Amino acid sequence: MERLLIVNADDFGLSKGQNYGIIEACRNGIVTSTTALVNGQAIDHAVQLSRDEPSLAIGMNFVLTMGKPLTAMPGLTRDGVLGKWIWQLAEEDALPLEEITQELASQYLRFIELFGRKPTHLDSHHHVHMFPQIFPIVARFAAEEGIALRIDRQPLSNAGDLPANLRSSHGFSSAFYGEEISEALFLQVLDDSSHRGERSLEVMCHPAFVDNTIRQSAYCFPRLTELEVLTSASLKYAIAERGYRLGSYLDV
């Protein structure tokens, strides 16, 4: 049985090094899809590069944890900036859901302005769309706009509440991450998905060249290792040998 594999590189627009890494992993590797940060410092650079790589499917990485929002978000920002304190607000059940709804719509419109088309799918920076308070907002929005949504089903307790017309892959994995990146790890992710009987799988990745912005990230040099693995000819062969077809969320 042929299975669909979506290799999605997060953080398009984070920095020029990140952008170049994603394009390299698409052009000479197995990355088929990316998600863009519309408030990223290098988003205009990402847009420019994407024009020369039409095969790269581009979704939107909804941002609530970094940089400046596009709308006024007094309930979520500090000194006008987003940050990881969103986890504390979620634990306290104090998230400004109306502000988040408006920001989602604004980032979506900004994406269309930048790229000239709808995103192929939605996900979020640091997976905040999987918060139980935020997930229904994003799921409903994706269904209404007719675009797919990354769903990590492990923490999802309200799967029965999904909109009937919401599209997603059957499986999602964030396991290709950390200090032990290798071809063997990537293939283990595929084998685990096959054993679960999933007909389609998204694997998240972060290939990049290291620049000053990436150096400031807690996840820095493994991004280079990811890039090396994702552009390996032997990995591409092993994926095909396992019965996977590379594609994007347009195929689900």
UniProtKB/Swiss-Prot annotation:
<keyword id="KW-0146">Chitin degradation</keyword>
<keyword id="KW-0479">Metal-binding</keyword>
<comment type="similarity">
    <text>Belongs to the YdjC deacetylase family. ChbG subfamily.</text>
</comment>
<keyword id="KW-0624">Polysaccharide degradation</keyword>
<dbReference type="GO" id="GO:0005737">
    <property type="term" value="C:cytoplasm"/>
</dbReference>
<dbReference type="InterPro" id="IPR006879">
    <property type="entry name" value="YdjC-like"/>
</dbReference>
<dbReference type="Pfam" id="PF04794">
    <property type="entry name" value="YdjC"/>
</dbReference>
<keyword id="KW-0460">Magnesium</keyword>
<comment type="pathway">
    <text>Glycan degradation; chitin degradation.</text>
</comment>
<dbReference type="InterPro" id="IPR022948">
    <property type="entry name" value="COD_ChbG_bac"/>
</dbReference>
<dbReference type="GO" id="GO:0052777">
    <property type="term" value="P:diacetylchitobiose catabolic process"/>
</dbReference>
<dbReference type="GO" id="GO:0036311">
    <property type="term" value="F:chitin disaccharide deacetylase activity"/>
</dbReference>
<feature type="binding site">
    <location>
        <position position="125"/>
    </location>
    <ligand>
        <name>Mg(2+)</name>
    </ligand>
</feature>
<keyword id="KW-0963">Cytoplasm</keyword>
<dbReference type="GO" id="GO:0006032">
    <property type="term" value="P:chitin catabolic process"/>
</dbReference>
<keyword id="KW-0119">Carbohydrate metabolism</keyword>
<dbReference type="GO" id="GO:0046872">
    <property type="term" value="F:metal ion binding"/>
</dbReference>
<dbReference type="GO" id="GO:0019213">
    <property type="term" value="F:deacetylase activity"/>
</dbReference>
<comment type="subunit">
    <text>Homodimer.</text>
</comment>
<dbReference type="GO" id="GO:0000272">
    <property type="term" value="P:polysaccharide catabolic process"/>
</dbReference>
<keyword id="KW-0378">Hydrolase</keyword>
<protein>
    <recommendedName>
        <fullName>Chitooligosaccharide deacetylase</fullName>
        <ecNumber>3.5.1.105</ecNumber>
    </recommendedName>
</protein>
<dbReference type="InterPro" id="IPR011330">
    <property type="entry name" value="Glyco_hydro/deAcase_b/a-brl"/>
</dbReference>
<comment type="function">
    <text>Involved in the degradation of chitin. ChbG is essential for growth on the acetylated chitooligosaccharides chitobiose and chitotriose but is dispensable for growth on cellobiose and chitosan dimer, the deacetylated form of chitobiose. Deacetylation of chitobiose-6-P and chitotriose-6-P is necessary for both the activation of the chb promoter by the regulatory protein ChbR and the hydrolysis of phosphorylated beta-glucosides by the phospho-beta-glucosidase ChbF.</text>
</comment>
